[in-house]
Amino acid sequence: LYYGDTIMENQTKLFQEMIDRAEAAVRKEISTWPEGTWTAEASADSDGMDLTKPVTVRGTLTIKNGELFFDYSATDPETTGMLNVHDYMTRSTTCCFTFLFLGEELLRYHNEGSTKPIHITTKPGTLVDSSPDAKIAAGVALTGCLIGEVVMSLLSQAIPEKAIAPYSRQITVNTVTIGKPGVYVTFCPSAGAGAVYGNDGYQCCATGSTLGNIGKTNIEDEMLRFPWEYIKYEFVTDNEGAGKWRGAPGIHYQVENHSTGRCMHQTGSWDGFKTSANMDKFAETAHALDAAGVP
């Protein structure tokens, strides 16, 4: 194809029009929200290095003149563990979770313009704006969830008719078999997504930073490829918690290792997660992992 000047100019105008329309639509929606300031925080048990010290993401939201102002300056300093994230990760996660509150009508049309009314402040050297040499291997999956919880808490306080409860936190990142080598990323012995105003939570989604885009793979396929047997993998009964709309039920997860070596879950302090979300002014989300004795 030959792209002459006229065609390129027309394409540029078209793309700019798409960006401008997205910005205008987002500003129009935000302008219907009440103005004010709200605060929230979410914590992990530790950074995986100092097991006695929790790490916390703290955020403030101000809504004014059809714009959103998120400020994470009060977040804890970056850590020696692998839970740090860089500034661009925080910005991306904040925008993604904000889009959840902007309605289905705009769902397919978000682009650069959608981010223009969203202003994000971070403090260099903190958990959410770490230095270039900080460890970040688990940052997106783990601290990303904390950022998402803070955003959902802030916006749920501001516009309760659009409230979203937290996703469950992941129990295990991966399973390592020693003897017959293998690494298996489970993603989903997690309970699932929290309730949304007007709707029950959705079971068996992965952690919040995936926005539900990752789910459990087929159990039979897993048992063919890896040397362990699923004894139980089913929803837990009566575990959703009180509320007008239920959360996800949680998972009863039990696996038997059939390899010649030992098999271990990398979890607990390694991933730095509490097993339930802990958000100020927000209902907690519960997990169940029977094999690990997690209530």
Where are these predicted regions, by residue range?
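Glycine/proline-enriched, intrinsically flexible loops and inter-domain linkers
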Residues: 1-295
